[in-house]
Amino acid sequence: MKKNLLLLLCLFCLVNVCHAKAKDTFTVFQLNLWHGCTKVPNGDQGIIDVLDQMDADVVFLCEIRDGKQFIPHVIEELEKRGKHYYGETFDLAIGVLSKFKPDSWTKCCIVPGDEGRAMVKMVATIEGQPVSFYSCHLDYRHYQCYMPRGYNGTTGKKMDKPITDEEEVLKANRQSFRDETIRAFIQEVQSDIQQGRPIIMGGDFNEPSHLDWQAD
């Protein structure tokens, strides 16, 4: 009898520990929809299936088509599968889905000349801790990691020869608005830092990994 009581007590403690641990964690997922999945057969259904399968607490989306209609549609379809989300795009090609009720939504990090690539910011309180989430899709132009391979970083067309001079590649790369957007982001998050909010950013940065710059 004592052994059974001890076993039940251990199981009870284990369940409570696991439950407490689950409250301390959440999942984040980022997905580039690639032209809104319009170039993929049954792409719309595929998006819903992937989001349902991943079941993330917060989702960053980019390359959204018709955000005013898309987000409500996704929320409705996921609701049918027992998953409740909030969402916002500010009519941009990016957006956020969240199982956590947002404290606020903001369109931010707006760069003159590249206004269409502003960020969507959500602040949500999770277990008493406000957290700031940023969804972005940085400028795709002047993606100059193509230059050493012999292709134009904006048009994708083949050039007469590869360009491997580091200074020339970096100079061409800086013609994009990526640096300006990140500077705006760094400025924006200062208020988050001052208020003790953790910061999570997700999106398509249109910058290669350092692994892409190796000799091979």
Q: Where in this protein do the model-derived segments appear?
A:
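N-terminal, active-site-proximal structural segment of metallo-dependent hydrolase catalytic domains
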Residues: 2-3, 18-80
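Sec-dependent N-terminal signal peptides
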Residues: 4-14
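Short coil/turn segments at beta-strand junctions that form active-site/ligand-binding loops
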Residues: 25, 129-130, 195-198
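Acidic/histidine-rich helix-loop elements
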Residues: 30-44, 66, 141-177
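Active-site flanking residues adjacent to catalytic metal/cofactor-binding acidic residues
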Residues: 31, 62, 136, 202-204
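Structured beta-strand-rich core segments of catalytic domains in phosphoester-bond hydrolases
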Residues: 62-152
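Metal-dependent phosphoesterases centered on the DNase I-like endonuclease/exonuclease/phosphatase
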Residues: 150-216
